[in-house]
Structure formats: structure tokens, C-alpha cells
Amino acid sequence: MKNMIYNLISISLYSLIIILTDIYAKTSSLICNKNDIYLNDKFYFLKKKKYILYDVNIGEGFNLQKEVLYRMSLVIYQLNKRDKEYIYYLVLPPWCYLSHWSNKRHDNLQWNIFLNMNIIKNVIPIIEFSDYKKLYGDVTDFIISFKYLLDSNAQKAKYYHVLPFDKCYIEDYKFKIVCKNCDYKYSVTYSGNCTNIKGKNTLCYSDYIVTNYLVNYVVHKLFYIHNINSILIKNSNVVLVPFPNELFENNIEDILLFNEKLIYNGNNYIKEILKNSNYISCHLRYNDFKKITSYDVPSVQIAILKLLYIMFMNNKEKIFISTDEKKYVQYIINKHFKQFKHFFYFYENKDNYHEGQVAIIEQWICANSSTFVGNIFSRFTMHIIWERYLITKGKEHQNIDLCGYSINNNEQLKNRYKKIQYIYDHSSIEKLNNIYNTYSEIDKKYIITLCFGFPSHFPSNLSIYRKKYIPFA
């Protein structure tokens, strides 16, 4: 009788596995697989789950948080590659407070309103914090953080140091001991003041360099030694940025694709308003950058003149601008460049998208232009160029930097660029209707100065996930 029951259970379980495998095969066939570590194991959903939560400094911008997601994805990918006993999930922190958003308070926005989550799930196991909270609450087994050893003997140290958690200072993390005799003794704020997370244990790890390999080793050891289910990594933006080839070799460099609806909105703008991809685009950042003297951003008036020069030089007829000072930029164009204002285009948020979604739409429009002009100090710019490299728009002449205003007499600023060119194009100057001649000699030289960044910082492969979305491809 027992054998009969056992056989029935075995047959039922086997049938369930076949059905679930078939369901997965049908749903995932719409997405190109890339030899994934966990999905290749047909029994992965039967493994015991482990969870890694993380966050960044309070208020950090959207694009930095995207970078950190790349770093943490690499940690998860490597954990699942090395450990066949458990399945490791990355818990995505909600969006509540960002210093760059005009509306700084939000109620736990999820990642799926910004990114295509199916693509990420195709490579690493993920779960939104709201779903984790339903299962386990606002708690975790360990709260840990990492910091850099800054003393002169740091590089001589053979092993990392393990310290009390409060030695990993994190601004506004509100670490406190909530009780002494309960399971979850400790509390920290989580993900832009979304909530507080309680933990059973806390630790700080320090080393002269904090790589994804160190994080991988530390969390794997904690999971096994303490037989725990979850770890929160506070301030995970201290983890070193991986090289693009590391991300490529681990199938991660192109998994952060924008939400499909936002891509379609951007493509509709390109097709209906710009008519084709034969336009230049630009990111002008002023709000906080004009206060940072080392960034040396040019005035809006000079920036607009330079954009016109670049447009004429490249034989284009449209300039799309993404900027945090939209009204002021439009005011300058209307006041000083009235005869050229028909060349300039700005995205209008007619569908009442969240401002973070608008930024993504504008990034996509910029990514698909024939030439992009950005700011080397801006992560917003960097992520546009990252997208451009993933859709074969990574050639040197296709990505230009606006240059700091003092580029021609500032050696420190010059060293930030791979190449600087001085191109006087007579026909382009003529098209500017003598406006060029009203500027000072310093301004004139700045206008014809073109700066180029380092391509080694970006991927070099066409993204299989983006191919079908490229307009006019």
C-alpha cells in the first residue's frame, strides 16, 4: 500500500514537472534565452530559495540605481552558477525617494513600471520587495554592509576585516537596537525611507577593494554557516563597477531593457514627430551641475549655438533635447535663436507619465538618434551611450561630448577625454547667419571643439533583446 502511494506521488510529481516545464517553454519562447544558469535546470523551482535584499544611499538617482542592479545581478548570477543546492533570488528595492525627482515622495513604486522584468527574469531570479514582504514581512536574517579600508596598510591585508555594523557608516541609515531579547534585534531604514527592515544579526565587512567576488564570497559563507534564508546588503553602491566584458561573459550587460510601453511611446515620437532616425540628440544638464565648478558646464546660449554647429556639420535638420531645464532652454532658443527654433524638438508628456518614465522615453529617443551629444559627468548621458552601444550606435563620430567650457585651457579637464578635435567647418559657420561672429574668440574656439570619451567603458555587442525595438532598422 505504501509503495502504491509512493508511486502515485512520484508519477504526479513527475507529471507536474513536465507540465510546468512545458508552460515555461511556451511563455519563454517569446524571449531569446542566453544559456541561463538557473533556467537551464528544469528542477530549479524545487530548490530551497535564498534571498538577497539590497539598497543604495538614500536619494541616489535612477541611473545609479540601475548601475547597482547590474552589480547585484552579477552577484546573484555567480551564486547560482556556483551553488547547485539552493536558488538565490535578488529582491528589488522599491522606489520611494529620489533627490532628482521633483515629487520626492512616492509610495513604493515597483521596477516593472520602468524596466522589462521578463528580460531580467530570463537571466537571474528576481522578486519585488512587495512580494517578498507578503512572504516574510519587513525582516531579514542578516543586515550587512561593506566599506573600503583607507589606511596605508590596507592593500597588505591578506583577508577582509569583519567589524561591528556601525563601523560601516551610512548616512541617514538610522541603525538602532530595537530590543535585546527578541529575534529581530536590529533595525535600519530601507530603500529611500520606504520602510524599516529588522534583522537578527548585523556585520560590517571592510577591504581595500569591494568587488562582486568579495560580496559573493561573504554572502555565500553566511548562508551556509548560519543556515539562513535572507541577507540585506546596505549601501550596495560601494560595490565596484564591473567591466563590460564581465557583464557580457555572464549574460548581464543588456538585461536592463526599458519597459516595452515606454519604448513604443518613444518609437511613436520618433516616427510621427521626427519622421526618421536622421536627427541629433542632446542631453543638457544644468539644475545641479551648474553648481559644480569642476564640471564647468557652458551657458545654455553657448550650448545651443554649439548644437546648431554640430547639426549643420553633420547635415542634419533636427535636434532633440532632453534637459532638466526645459523651460529655460526653450526661453533661450526663442530669445536668441528665433530663426533656428524650428530645428529644436522636446518631448511633451501628453500621457501623464511618471517623471521617471518620461526620462526613460527621452533616453530611448536620444539612444536612437544618428548622433548624440552628452555630458561626460552625467550618468543620464552614460546610460544613453550604453544603450547606443547595444544597438550598434557606438562609433566615435556618433557620440560626442559637449565639453566643459574651459576645455581649451584646462589640462585636468582635457585628461577626462580620449580625444579632442578642433573642426572649423566653413559651410556650417555660414549657415549660422553671422551669429557665430558676435561671440568672443574664446567662445568661437569652444564651439568648434569636439570631445570624445573612452569606448572601453561601454559594451561592444548588439543586444538580442533590443533588435526588434529599433525604429527604422
From Swiss-Prot:
Q: Please give one Pfam family short name.
A: O-FucT
Instruction: Name the keywords, alphabetized.
Output: Carbohydrate metabolism, Endoplasmic reticulum, Fucose metabolism, Glycosyltransferase, Signal, Transferase
As recorded in UniProt, its EC number(s) are 2.4.1.221
Q: Secretion signal: which residues?
A: 1-25
UniProt record, GO biological process: fucose metabolic process
Compartment annotation: Endoplasmic reticulum
User: Which residue positions does UniProt flag as site: Essential for catalytic activity?
Assistant: E387
**Alphabetized InterPro entries for the sequence:** GDP-Fuc_O-FucTrfase, OFUT2-like
Q: What class of enzyme is it?
A: transferase
Reaction(s) catalysed by this chain, per the record, are: L-seryl-[protein] + GDP-beta-L-fucose = 3-O-(alpha-L-fucosyl)-L-seryl-[protein] + GDP + H(+); L-threonyl-[protein] + GDP-beta-L-fucose = 3-O-(alpha-L-fucosyl)-L-threonyl-[protein] + GDP + H(+)
Its pathway? Answer: Protein modification; protein glycosylation
Q: Name one GO molecular function term.
A: peptide-O-fucosyltransferase activity
Write out the GO cellular component annotations.
Answer: endoplasmic reticulum
* Residues the entry annotates as binding GDP-beta-L-fucose: G59, E60, G61, F62, N63, H283, L284, R285, R379, F380
The disruption phenotype is:
In S.stephensi mosquito vector, number of oocysts in the midgut, number of sporozoites in the salivary glands, and sporozoite gliding motility are normal. Infection of mouse host is normal including invasion of hepatocytes and infection of erythrocytes.
Catalytic residues (UniProt): E60 (proton acceptor)
- Primary role: Catalyzes the reaction that attaches fucose through an O-glycosidic linkage to a conserved serine or threonine residue in the consensus sequence C1-X-X-S/T-C2 of thrombospondin type I repeats (TSRs) where C1 and C2 are the first and second cysteines of the repeat, respectively. O-fucosylates sporozoite proteins CSP and TRAP. O-fucosylation regulates stability and intracellular trafficking of TRAP but not of CSP. Dispensable for parasite transmission to the mosquito vector and/or infection of the vertebrate host hepatocytes.
Annotated family: Belongs to the glycosyltransferase 68 family.
Q: What is this protein called?
A: GDP-fucose protein O-fucosyltransferase 2
